[in-house]
């Protein structure tokens, strides 16, 4: 019995020592280097288990034409990204779902569908991007990629710069913009108007620039943001639909 008591005391003592050794992030003091800034950003931007977004999406083509439609996005952390795009009067144009393994897509206008490996996203956008990247960008909490960064403070923001990554961070430690450069292709995302709950942005602009391909420029303006509520992510392919090539 005495040995058991001593054992429990040792566990409690060891646990308290571990707890004391954890350095809490001090948000009251401005960061002095890249390591301190990254620590604040990652601690300040924790993803919700569920996220529901509603708004309008605009796709800008290189020919300067613009297509604007309604959009609803539902994200279950590390599981699924579901999206429905609608024309005026709420008529669904297409529905898509991304998992860590696959892309599911239904086109209502021509009654077609496809199911492809998630790696096809990189081919569609002509840049290296994975499920986790898309999830973090949509949830407005992208992680700063491990690298050696130069640190700079401007009037209201901070900048982290490396050879292939650039981040602009607000004084509330939210990422305002990120740039990833690989093989001459730039993937750029920008957030603006942090007006919603949890300091969530009103607008996301996503741009892929390539010297040899057409630009992919997409802007989403959110009108409604819901955190932490379980959402339906139904995806049923009608039997009459034909598989697209």
Which residues does each predicted region cover?
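N-terminal leader/targeting segments and the immediate start of mature chains
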Residues: 17-67, 242-245
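One face of beta-strands
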Residues: 49-57, 67-73, 79-85, 94-96, ...
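Beta-strand elements of well-folded, non-transmembrane domains
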Residues: 59-61, 75-77, 87-89, 208-212, ...
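C-terminal low-complexity, charged extensions that often adopt amphipathic alpha-helices
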Residues: 124-127, 132-152
């Amino acid at each position: 019995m005495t040995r058991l008591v001593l054992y429990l005391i040792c566990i409690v003592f060891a646990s308290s020592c571990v707890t004391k050794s954890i350095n809490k992030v001090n948000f009251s003091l401005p960061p002095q280097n890249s390591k301190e800034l990254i620590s604040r950003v990652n601690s300040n931007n924790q993803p919700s288990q569920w996220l529901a977004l509603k708004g309008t999406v605009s796709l800008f083509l290189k020919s300067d034409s613009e297509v604007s439609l309604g959009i609803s996005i539902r994200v279950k952390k590390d599981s699924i990204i579901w999206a429905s795009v609608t024309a005026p009067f709420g008529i669904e144009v297409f529905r898509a779902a991304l998992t860590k393994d696959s892309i599911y897509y239904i086109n209502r206008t021509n009654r077609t569908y496809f199911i492809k490996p998630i790696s096809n996203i990189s081919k569609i956008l002509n840049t290296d991007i994975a499920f986790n990247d898309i999830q973090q960008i949509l949830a407005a909490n992208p992680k700063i990629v491990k690298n050696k960064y130069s640190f700079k403070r401007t009037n209201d923001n901070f900048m982290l710069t490396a050879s292939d990554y650039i981040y602009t961070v607000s004084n509330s430690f939210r990422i305002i913009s990120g740039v990833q450069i690989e093989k001459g292709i730039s993937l750029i995302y920008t957030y603006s108007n942090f007006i919603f709950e949890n300091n969530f942005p009103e607008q996301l602009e996503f741009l892929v620039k390539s010297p040899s391909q057409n630009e992919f420029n997409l802007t989403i303006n959110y009108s409604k943001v819901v955190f932490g509520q379980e959402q339906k992510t139904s995806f049923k392919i009608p039997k009459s639909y034909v598989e697209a090539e």
